[in-house]
Swiss-Prot record:
Record key words, sorted: Electron transport, Membrane, Mitochondrion, NAD, Respiratory chain, Translocase, Transmembrane, Transmembrane helix, Transport, Ubiquinone
Record-listed E.C. numbers: 7.1.1.2
Localisation per UniProt entry: Mitochondrion membrane
Protein name: NADH-ubiquinone oxidoreductase chain 3
Organism per entry: Cyprinus carpio (Common carp)
Family statement: Belongs to the complex I subunit 3 family.
Functional summary from the UniProt entry: Core subunit of the mitochondrial membrane respiratory chain NADH dehydrogenase (Complex I) that is believed to belong to the minimal assembly required for catalysis. Complex I functions in the transfer of electrons from NADH to the respiratory chain. The immediate electron acceptor for the enzyme is believed to be ubiquinone.
């Protein structure tokens, strides 16, 4: 219990110190030079901020979601060595069903079609 209180005290103190120091640090003042893109000393030819495809962002988020799902289900073969493997497999199946329903919903809403 004493170790937990020590760690908790250090964590709270460090958080308060860092929050206080962040207010004292100089604020960033953006100007035209700081906001302009750097092109090896040449004047910029165009805008450095290109438009980002919202479809690409949606597909990337879906990829990360399903990649995380696979990473969470990788230790599942060792689930039969637990005291209650039925509960583990039940929750894994529930997660798979929910994510499959989400994928079907995205598919029917046209979220996976690339053409605009």
């Amino acid at each position: 219990m004493n170790l937990i209180m020590t760690i908790l005290t250090i964590t709270v103190a460090l958080s308060l110190i860092l929050a206080t120091v962040s207010f004292w640090l100089p604020q960033m003042n953006p100007d035209a030079e700081k906001l302009s893109p750097y092109e090896c000393g040449f004047d910029p030819l165009g805008s450095a901020r290109l438009p980002f495809s919202l479809r690409f962002f949606l597909v990337a988020i879906l990829f990360l979601l399903f990649d995380l799902e696979i990473a969470l289900l990788l230790p599942l073969p060792w689930g039969d060595q637990l005291h209650n493997p039925t509960g583990t497999f039940f929750w894994a199946t529930t997660v798979l069903i929910l994510l499959t329903l989400g994928l079907i919903y995205e598919w029917t809403q046209g979220g996976l079609e690339w053409a605009e």
